[in-house]
A protein has these predicted regions:
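Positively charged n-region of N-terminal signal peptides that target proteins for export
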Residues: 1-4
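Sec-dependent N-terminal signal peptides
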Residues: 6-10
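Contiguous interface-forming segments/domains that mediate binding rather than catalysis
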Residues: 12, 16-233
Length: 233
């Protein structure tokens, strides 16, 4: 009888400890999520969002961090009418789509809502793409008067190279204009995404998330992880 009573006491104590641990873990998760979102807000992450959209964007980010913590990734909400992220930072960047056809100029056109928020003009002057059966693909684009050679005699699948190189060109143009936002890439292939961040925002977000394939990366680091050819300009 005493043995049964002792076992019951042990079971009850274990249940109490487990419940207390879950409560503490939930509390820590809540604190971490609020701290993360508050820091993003402090760093100006939501400053381009419409005033009425900011609360829902913060809530969406809170829920992501509460659920996944540092194993998660950045998230956003989309305007149903324009299909543009309400924070004006986040975009899908499918490597296959960017590489093929007019994917490069199409991407620049897709990013125009953010450029408008930054108060900068990123204008395509010309775009040319030539394929040679022996030499491969050659692609040039002129942005704000500057010619960028994206590909020269390129014979591989450029699902990684195309997003990385056009992002590099855009970043150079933003830097010329004195804009402190630049493109960082997340994941790759058909799951690729890009996000505009300041260096300070990126430093904080990079340190918070653990998975290198789910957090925003500078272009050279992203290229190494995705095993792309290095930047050529």
């Amino acid at each position: 009888m005493k043995k049964i009573f002792f076992v019951l006491i042990i079971i009850i104590l274990i249940i109490i400890v487990v419940k207390l641990y879950k409560i503490k873990a939930k509390s820590n998760s809540e604190h971490t999520a609020e701290e993360f979102v508050n820091k993003l807000d402090e760093l100006g992450y939501f400053k381009y969002a419409k005033k009425e959209d900011a609360p829902s964007l913060k809530k969406e980010m809170l829920e992501m961090i509460r659920k996944y913590g540092s194993e998660g990734t950045l998230t956003t909400l989309w305007d149903e009418n324009t299909n543009v992220a309400k924070d004006y930072r986040f975009y899908f960047c499918d490597g296959e789509t960017v590489f093929e056809g007019d994917g490069i100029p199409d991407l620049i056109n897709d990013l125009q809502p953010s450029f408008e928020k930054f108060g900068v003009k990123i204008k395509i002057g010309s775009f040319s793409e030539e394929w040679d059966d022996e030499k491969g693909l050659s692609t040039q684009i002129k942005i704000n008067g500057t010619e960028y050679e994206i590909f020269k005699n390129f014979k591989k699948s450029g699902w990684g190279e195309a997003p990385m190189r056009i992002a590099h060109a855009i970043n150079k143009e933003l830097e010329k204009k004195g804009i402190n936002e630049k493109i960082y890439l997340i994941s790759g292939g058909n799951d690729g995404k890009l996000v505009f961040l300041t260096e300070e925002q990126h430093k904080y977000i990079y340190a918070f998330f653990k998975d290198s394939k789910e957090k925003p990366l500078e272009l050279n680091e992203w290229g190494k992880i995705m095993k792309t050819e290095p930047l050529n300009f």
